[in-house]
Amino acid sequence: MKQKPIDDELKYLDERSRDIFRHIVEAYLNDGEPVGSRNLSRLLRQTLSPATIRNVMSDLEHLGLIYAPHVSAGRMPTQSGLRFFVDAFMEAGDLPNEERESIEAQVKEAGHAQSVEHFLVQASQILSDLSRGAGLVLASKYEGTLKHIEFVRLDGQQALAVLVTQQGEVENRIVHLPKGVTHAQLTEATNFLNAHIQGRTLSEAKEEIARLCSETRAALDHLSHHLVETGLALWGGEDADHKIHLIVRGRSNLLEDVKAEEDLERLRHLFDDLETRESMAQLLDLTDEGPGVRIFIGSENKLFSLSGSSLVVAPYRDSQQRVIGALGVIGPTRLNYARIVPMVNYTAQLVSQLLR
């Protein structure tokens, strides 16, 4: 997509051309249909003949901002046209107080969930309900801070390692015990870990325990030391610190805009692509490239190249302002961007606050 030449020429669009273009896009965002010169003449503040409007539309089409979906039809914005509209015309102000209060109440209610994952599922559903699109959350597997770990002796040479986060999530792993480990040594290892992991993320706790183990080898007996080193490492397989999972709610909302079988196929491609680990990691990285909300229209991002969809997404952060996930709305390219952008931004801020 060669955007640069278009950008250069757009700087010289006169007020009349901008006004006609803006009305074409707004009509498309409202009903998804092309608009013709006769209808435009009734919408414009200026009194212009249909012939004059057609001449301007021809110039806009030459610039790649609008196109005719079929012969003798009106005009609709291209992907480049939508991008220009979002960048040059859209005013994404604050949400109305009533909507802010509604979102805040729903997110806080969801915050009472028993686990972080359930809370994020609820956040995804809230975005879907508010936008009438699909709500999306990308979540790092271990974004929570740790509360404690415990070793529970099982039969034979095995114990159950139980890791609990301050957000209420519980993870269990089986650990194989060295021969001769006593109950007292299990307790010693548990106490040592709990003295140093509380309030830290998993990756921070691992670094701290590794540092302490190298310094305190003489302070712990051999078997207790082995348990300490093994404890948090149980959660290190398959890059667990960076494992990302996808939560989507409201996929059926996207079907309301499907007008042909090929549209359905594009949506299938979208969700197939999103659910690959590489794509999710890429999308999470993109949200960290700049502050605030990111807008991806159509094929601007390769994840959406086949889908004809747009994504409005914002990161949510931990207490150290590190990006630990992202949430947003997927919908057709004719999303109500002016409403969706502040909605996603405010929801991301609330989620960040509740996860700290």
From Swiss-Prot:
Source species, domain of life: Bacteria
InterPro entries: GAF-like_dom_sf (IPR029016), HrcA (IPR002571), HrcA_C (IPR021153), WH-like_DNA-bd_sf (IPR036388), WH_DNA-bd_sf (IPR036390), WHTH_HrcA_DNA-bd (IPR005104), WHTH_transcript_rep_HrcA_IDD (IPR023120)
Keywords, comma-separated and alphabetical: Repressor, Stress response, Transcription, Transcription regulation
Pfam families reported in the protein's UniProt record: HrcA (PF01628), HrcA_DNA-bdg (PF03444)
GO molecular function, one term: DNA binding
GO biological process assignments: negative regulation of DNA-templated transcription
Similarity section: Belongs to the HrcA family.
Annotated function: Negative regulator of class I heat shock genes (grpE-dnaK-dnaJ and groELS operons). Prevents heat-shock induction of these operons.
NCBIfam families listed in its UniProt record: hrcA
Annotated protein name in UniProt: Heat-inducible transcription repressor HrcA
Organism: Bartonella quintana (strain Toulouse)
